[in-house]
Amino acid sequence: MEIKEEHKEICGSIATCQENNRSFTLKNATDFIKVKIDGAVFPNGDKTVRCDYLFFNEKEQERIIEIFVELKGKDVEKAIKQLEQSIEMFAQSNRRYAFAVATNVSTQFNTLIQKKTKEFKQKKHTDLKVRSKAVQCNYHTDTNTLSISQ
């Protein structure tokens, strides 16, 4: 699915998105574009299942890395489904990450998270990370990879 220019925001050295005490921060984000999917690409009220944000960088109109982000309350399973759908609609790069940032990640979801993490890697070629409340990542330009700050 094509993303209109009006929905793209050029990032500075630090890019963030936040919602109801949940946040995602990307450091060294100078070459990234931030897209608000839920509420912009798909207006509020649209029933399409989708994640909240997509970050990507590109070189010569080709995406190098994509980061899908869902900021969710408690329903981790729904967050994962939203990420899956968004990857199917928007993925263009072979290097992808997906983050579900929930209010509280219960230990009852450990088995589901492990299963989905493995499934994402095999079927979607995407690294899935599920975290509580806040995530900070660093982008490494030399390897086009992310590391999660602890």
Describe each PLM feature range:
Residues 48-58:
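A short, structured beta-strand/loop element
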Residues 1-12, 16, 130-150:
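A cross-taxonomic marker for long C-terminal extensions/tails that follow the last structured domain
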Residues 1-45:
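Acidic-basic catalytic patches of nuclease active cores, encompassing PD-(D/E)XK
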Residues 81-91:
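Histidine-anchored nucleotide/phosphate-binding helix
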Residues 45-46, 64, 75-83, 109-113:
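Active-site-adjacent loop/helix micro-motif of nuclease/hydrolase catalytic cores
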Residues 76, 90-116:
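Nucleic-acid nuclease catalytic cores
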Residues 106-124, 133-148:
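Outer-membrane beta-barrel translocator/channel fold
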Residues 53-55, 65-73:
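Conserved catalytic cores of phosphodiester-cleaving nucleases, focusing on short active-site segments
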